[in-house]
């Protein structure tokens, strides 16, 4: 595992499983830089995202998902937006 600089994380809304629109106004295709724009992301979604982001940042992987990627849903059952977190390494 590379113990150097931590990768950047990009979070993108990729789908919606619930019947209602997002209360925070997020739409499919919205994308955020975790380091500079995380304050724009719904707190409920961030609560779900943080463990995935932490694992990606430190080189972990998830069963059934590509390396450097984590897909998860927000915890609002009425909305259930699907998010994709991606590890972005500087060249």
Report residues per predicted region.
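Short, compact, well-ordered microdomains
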Residues: 59-91
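Short, charged beta-turn/beta-strand-edge "cap" motif at the junction between a beta-strand
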Residues: 36-42
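Short, structured beta-strand/loop micro-motifs enriched in basic residues and often containing a Trp
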Residues: 8-18
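Short, compositionally biased
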Residues: 43-60
């Amino acid at each position: 595992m590379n113990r150097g600089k931590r990768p950047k994380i990009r979070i993108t809304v990729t789908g919606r499983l619930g019947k209602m629109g997002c209360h925070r106004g997020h739409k499919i295709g919205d994308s955020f830089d975790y380091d500079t724009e995380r304050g724009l992301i719904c707190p409920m979604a961030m609560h779900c995202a943080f463990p995935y982001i932490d694992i990606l940042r430190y080189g972990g992987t998830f069963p059934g998902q590509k390396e450097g990627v984590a897909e998860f849903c927000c915890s609002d059952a009425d909305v259930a937006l699907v998010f994709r977190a991606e590890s972005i390494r500087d060249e």
